[in-house]
Amino acid sequence: HSPKWRQQLGSLGGGNHFIELCLDETDTVWMFLHSGSRGVGNKIAQKHIAIAKKLMAKWWIPIENNDLAYLVQGTPEFGSYIKDLHWAQRFAFLNREEMMDRFSTCLSEFMGTDVEEVERINCHHNYTQREEHAGHTVWLTRKGAVNADEGRLALIPGSMGTASYVVEGKGNDQSLHSAPHGAGRRYSR
């Protein structure tokens, strides 16, 4: 993992990551932040994608596009990937928790009173997990998407100048219980 992960815990990062105060239609104040694993997850993914590409060639597994290389479940390489993946996802979760704690403290100090936190919604937007779909247990990757199980709350961040949203999942089977995580990018990173 990144040698700087300890210094990165509790930090926002760049790109489309942000912290903001929002008002909803009832004038309720929301502390909203959008961030992730600070690049650690991407580095882990690149490492394991390179391993998958080598294994595809070694095992003579034909694939139409080298970018579709995969790790075979049950292999040591797959196990290593899942272990690293869970570490990165936990780091991203704790990173957002730490920032939200700091945000709440700063807002309390600014307002001169305690902030009443009613609920906290912390959701991944780039991740993989085991789920049940259409009677099968699968490894589902959501890239730029959030879990939209029926009743589950999620966040859809806007872009500069557009609103962010708290949404409730509908559990749509056709979308694999997924929803877009944001407006997307105009240009590639």
Question: Where in this protein do the model-derived segments appear?
Answer:
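Domain-length cofactor-binding catalytic modules of enzymes
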Residues: 1-189
